[in-house]
Amino acid sequence: MGKPTAKKKNPETPKDASGGGGGGGGKSGKTYHRSTSRVFDEDMEIFISRALELKEEGNKLFQKRDHEGAMLSFDKALKLLPKDHIDVAYLRTSMASCYMQMGLGEYPNAISECNLALEASPRYSKALVRRSRCYEALNKLDYAFRDARIVLNMEPGNVSANEIFDRVKKVLVDKGIDVDEMEKDFVDVQPVCAARLKKIVKERLRKSKKKKKSGGKDEELKSPKVVVVDKGDEAEGRNKPKEEKSDKSDIDGKIGGKREEKKTSFKSDKGQKKKSGGNKAGEERKVEDKVVVMDKEVIASEIVDGGGSKKEGATVTRTIKLVHGDDIRWAQLPLDSTVRLVRDVIRDRFPALRGFLIKYRDTEGDLVTITTTDELRLAASTHDKLGSLRLYIAEVNPDQEPTYDGMSNTESTDKVSKRLSSLADNGSVGEYVGSDKASGCFENWIFQFAQLFKNHVGFDSDSYVDLHDLGMKLYTEAMEDAVTGEDAQELFQIAADKFQEMGALALLNWGNVHMSKARKQVCIPEDASREAIIEAVEAAFVWTQNEYNKAAEKYEEAIKVKPDFYEALLALGQEQFEHAKLCWYHALKSKVDLESEASQEVLKLYNKAEDSMERGMQIWEEMEECRLNGISKLDKHKNMLRKLELDELFSEASEEETVEQTANMSSQINLLWGSLLYERSIVEYKLGLPTWDECLEVAVEKFELAGASATDIAVMVKNHCSSESALEGMGFKIDEIVQAWNEMYDAKRWQMGVPSFRLEPMFRRRAPKLHDILENVFSGPV
């Protein structure tokens, strides 16, 4: 990339205060200049050193994507450096890069920084490449083509310039533009040297002064006056003498066959002051000329309303806030901007929005939608009363976006941006207004031609629209009659019941997931110490208890959704049963008695589990009785759908499958209930409660209803912990024989082909191994 070249500055020796140029006066002036220059050089070294530190700090912030902080560091460095320093162009280009990273809306500011960089170093290729990228993004392809070509003239191997040049060239060719002719104009163009332009300006000034002296007062009055301001002095805040007025001089340069503006600014010598009592009108000032080759920036303030004048001048802008939820962005708009311009600026600031409404908050606090320019000006009139002007953006479907002053919703954003770019290039408001008028005439012509064509061929599209509207109206009326009828209410009730059952079933399955997670294995190394084992077991106990609580919560929510959902009641009963066993085995680590808190918690869980089992069993038996009598809710639904010929929506099992499934359901519920009572009898016996034998008797009854054999029941009773002939430990493992019964039923079911049902996964779920681990750890030898 090109390295910025520093400008050589020849400091002039200041004149003696007395105005003398000879002998001793010259000597004293020379001595004063040397001492002042030495102090100036020492201070400047400090400033330059600090500026370099700020430059490095800005580079680090840029790498961290803190673009605003980086620009602040670069700006501070620029204020410390002399204007002819070699790093000025680099800092300006770095600020342009920061603006480019902040979005398309900041590209005009990036172009401005590139222009300032090229003012400091006209052959700095990085600034040209950055500016070319900005022009390409803003659809100013001719300017992008020019800058890329200039860089390639200086550096044929510049990769970035080659990429931009090829892309822009391809787009221009697709648009039918003669790129070869443009390339011929730019092939030998080099950046204009600042020294050469300075010489041209001085020559023009000398000629204009001669014309003033010879032309007299009349010619002087006719010539236009301009006030020349030194931007460098204004930025540093130093005192400046009054600027002289001079004739407006233009420098015509041809780059690629196109004319560009060249702005000339003059800076007066700071070391010279006016004499208050002198007879002369004023001493002649020395002028340092600067020539800046700057392209017009594409900013929203350049686009003014159609009624504005065609004269070029500074457009008064207003700063507004664009509020989209929590995203608030600044924007600059002219005072007389139109609602279409505001729409385009919002699309540029929020490119992800496909459709939106523009709103403002009135004096009553309501958000009012803006659709016309008059409404926009009304919103601006509340600016003084309510503080800063805020425009609120509400995202909507593109079909719901309103038309803005005659513009259709389907107008392409690319076309709008091209129109704005073309307007900024031409700089003429009149042409923009003329294009709107031409567009209106063109639309009227299409409308008139369409009317003639329809009359000529006898084609009437309105009749089709009328037929469609009539058909939709009749269809809506018919649907309204069907929806409000008595039969529809019954169908709605069927649909509501099915959705209710579906929601409850989803919560049931959600709870089953947590029950499965509670069976997480405990990994204990073989050589682990007892302390490590207890620590691992305690962590597993906390995990399992949390999962049990989550499962119970989901089962209870399912019951709230569908109160007669017996599956959720049975699942809740099993969860409370397993939770009670977990708490009992965990309580064995300390001395267990009836008065302890752990014992009371275990008995409370057993009571809840029994209540849930009883309620679930009762609801299921009532539903089975209604089904057998033909008065169930499902039978009513089938009859209703059969009348409407929609009975195929329900799949019905055969009578044999229904009988087998009912028998299996009863067996599984009684088996689970018997296991619960058997385990409770063991707990009550250990706690010394006299009701343990009653629980054992009821458990035996439940096992008999479940279809267990007399031999298996006798083995269970014999191995109860209350029996003298029972095995050592906590008693017979009821879970093992229940699992054996389930496996026997599985084999039978596969032979008969009986379909499974919702609770079967719950009944098949094995007890967590954590129960055995807790029993072995806390009841074993210490």
UniProtKB/Swiss-Prot annotation:
rRNA-binding is among the record's keywords: no
Annotated segments matching region Disordered: 1-33, 206-287
TPR repeat residue numbers: 51-84, 89-124, 126-158, 444-478, 532-565, 590-623
Pfam families noted in UniProt: PB1
SUPFAM superfamilies on file: CAD & PB1 domains (SSF54277), TPR-like (SSF48452)
Biased amino acid composition, Gly residues: 18-28
Residues passing through the membrane, by range: none
Disruption phenotype: No clumped-chloroplasts phenotype. Phox1 and phox4 double mutants show no clumped-chloroplasts phenotype, but a 46% reduction in root hair growth. Phox1, phox3 and phox4 triple mutants and phox1, phox2, phox3 and phox4 quadruple mutants show a 70% reduction in root hair growth.
GO cellular component, one term: plant-type vacuole
Presence of keyword Repeat: yes
Bias type Basic and acidic residues, positions: 215-271
Conditions for induction: Up-regulated by abscisic acid treatment, and by cold, osmotic and salt stress.
Record domain PB1: where: 317-396
Protein keywords: Repeat, TPR repeat
Biological function: Carboxylate clamp-type tetratricopeptide repeat protein that may act as a potential Hsp90/Hsp70 co-chaperone. Contributes to polar growth of root hairs.
Name the UniProt record assigns to this protein: Protein PHOX4
Biological source species: Arabidopsis thaliana
